[in-house]
């Protein structure tokens, strides 16, 4: 499969974009990021600054920045200028336009999205150019952020996920002598209230560029509003800025909570912190320990322009349990259980019911195609917890709703007729909602997925000190990627063979094919034979 591309000088921007050697670009950027990490660990701040400048002024980094904003989910969402880089010509010209000198970001376009509680969350949508500039500077800032990050911070960090945070909760709370009390932290409007002064004084990046982003303003209903605090919620670099704002809390708790008992023997008050973006918990041996921590927490946040919500910040006994990242964590008769929270189950079932009710006249196959991705996605998220019983209950609720859907379609038919039409014996189950069709003389069966079929697998947590930008951790992340892919390809020998044959790489972009990024099997004719490859979905769409 001839997929090698080279960077070349050409007068045709469309051809120039297609001729970019993405493997070479990724390699150049990765090398500079590794050097930034090395210099930062050695305390060579001048060298870090120099490498940041080199990276943000390189063609390779600019090309990757443009590629990311034109392939992510927001690629079809314009800013205030209405511009979208949908052509190869526009993309290549965008690379050439990313310059520090004379750069002036445009105001954000204010939109509102619904939160889980029904309230509206404000988002600021930057223009495509501003997104690309943020993506460019993020390439230089992210490696530094990883070096300085709290070890048990898991949100919006490369190679980390919600399941890592939940597994860390399980690690620190599951033992017999584990802490019994938990402080559930809630920060009032974290993104909206971060101090600009604190960011400009503490974020190790080009302060002129950062200040322009922070002060660019917001346009809503044709009116321009100044931004005096907070970071652009909706900006590519915003989650990293928020993370760096909250980093340091773990060290503060560690230094302030070394106590001595009466026998002059040091003991730990069992203070641990687990954070995912602005959601966090802090554990303690006693309720009094956590009450003493609250003033420290308030002071730490106040320095950054943030405020702890007194109403929503709770101190809970582990036997009563608490909700965190969609899971409920509690001890029952001394055994720690992490299972889907009642709120999460209700929200999911409401989504399922809405999908079914919105498609009353659709074909059965359409309903199955709409529901299967939801069922698989939700089950995969919660498969790391004690979720089997919940999965069974959810399956039953979905069955009841589909039975109502089928009865409504045929009000004059009996139950047996409806059951025979829509529900069939499949594998070991009698009541499987499925469609049978005959194509080319073969019977195709398309069943609805059962959540209970999802195997419960304890998540293998990332090592807290692991840094994906540090060359010293390269072999660790390669082993971790292999483990995840083996898990996702278990029982699919042909796919596993292709993955190994391709040396884990996508043949179009040269990047790793992992369980986290969507991929598919694509066919190509070579020397009169059909050859199959594993390819990233986004790469295939770009190269069609």
Report the location of each language-model feature.
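Extended C-terminal regions of large enzymes
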Residues: 397-401, 406-497, 505
């Amino acid at each position: 499969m001839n997929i090698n591309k080279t960077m070349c000088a050409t007068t045709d921007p469309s051809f120039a974009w297609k001729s970019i050697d993405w493997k070479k670009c990724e390699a150049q950027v990765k090398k500079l990021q590794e050097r930034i990490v090395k210099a930062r660990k050695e305390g060579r701040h001048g060298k870090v600054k120099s490498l940041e400048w080199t990276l943000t002024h390189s063609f390779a980094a600019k090309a990757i920045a443009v590629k990311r904003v034109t392939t992510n989910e927001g690629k079809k969402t314009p800013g205030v200028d209405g511009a979208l880089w949908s052509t190869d010509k526009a993309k290549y010209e965008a690379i050439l336009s990313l310059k520090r000198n004379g750069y002036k970001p445009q105001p954000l376009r204010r939109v509102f999205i619904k939160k889980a509680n029904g309230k509206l969350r404000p988002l600021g949508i930057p223009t495509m150019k501003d997104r690309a500039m943020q993506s460019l500077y993020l390439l230089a800032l992210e490696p530094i952020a990883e070096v300085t990050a709290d070890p048990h911070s898991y949100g919006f960090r490369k190679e980390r996920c919600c399941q890592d945070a939940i597994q860390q909760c399980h690690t620190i709370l599951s033992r017999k002598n584990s802490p019994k009390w938990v402080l559930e932290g809630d920060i009032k409007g974290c993104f909206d209230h971060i101090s600009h002064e604190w960011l400009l004084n503490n974020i190790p990046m080009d302060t002129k560029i950062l200040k322009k982003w922070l002060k660019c303003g917001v346009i809503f209903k044709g009116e321009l509003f100044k931004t005096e605090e907070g970071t652009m919620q909706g900006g590519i670099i915003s989650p990293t800025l928020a993370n760096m704002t909250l980093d340091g809390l773990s060290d503060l708790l560690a230094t302030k909570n070394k106590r001595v008992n009466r026998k002059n023997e040091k003991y730990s008050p069992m203070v641990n912190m687990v954070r995912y973006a602005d959601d966090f918990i802090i554990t303690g041996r006693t309720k009094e320990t956590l009450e003493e921590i609250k003033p420290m927490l308030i002071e730490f946040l106040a320095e950054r322009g943030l405020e702890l919500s007194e109403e929503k910040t709770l101190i809970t006994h582990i036997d009563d349990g608490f909700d965190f990242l969609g899971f409920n964590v509690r001890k029952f008769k001394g055994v720690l259980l992490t299972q889907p929270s009642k709120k999460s189950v209700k929200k999911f079932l409401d989504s399922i019911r809405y999908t079914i009710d919105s498609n009353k006249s659709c074909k059965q196959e359409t309903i199955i195609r709409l529901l299967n991705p939801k069922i698989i996605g939700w089950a995969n998220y919660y498969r790391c917890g004690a979720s089997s019983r919940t999965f069974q209950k959810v399956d039953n609720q979905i069955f009841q709703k589909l039975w109502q859907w089928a009865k409504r379609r045929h009000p004059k038919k009996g139950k047996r007729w409806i059951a025979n039409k829509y529900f069939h014996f499949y594998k070991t189950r009698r009541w499987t909602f499925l469609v049978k069709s005959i194509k080319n003389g073969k019977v195709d069966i398309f069943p609805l997925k059962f959540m209970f079929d999802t195997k419960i697998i304890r998540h293998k947590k990332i090592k807290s000190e692991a840094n994906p930008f540090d060359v010293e951790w390269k072999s660790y992340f390669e082993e971790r990627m292999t483990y995840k892919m083996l898990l996702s390809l278990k029982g699919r020998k042909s796919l596993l063979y292709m993955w190994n044959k391709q040396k884990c790489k996508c043949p179009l972009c040269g990047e790793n094919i992992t369980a986290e990024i969507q991929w598919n099997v694509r066919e190509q004719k070579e020397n009169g034979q059909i050859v199959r490859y594993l390819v990233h979905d986004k790469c295939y769409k770009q190269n069609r």
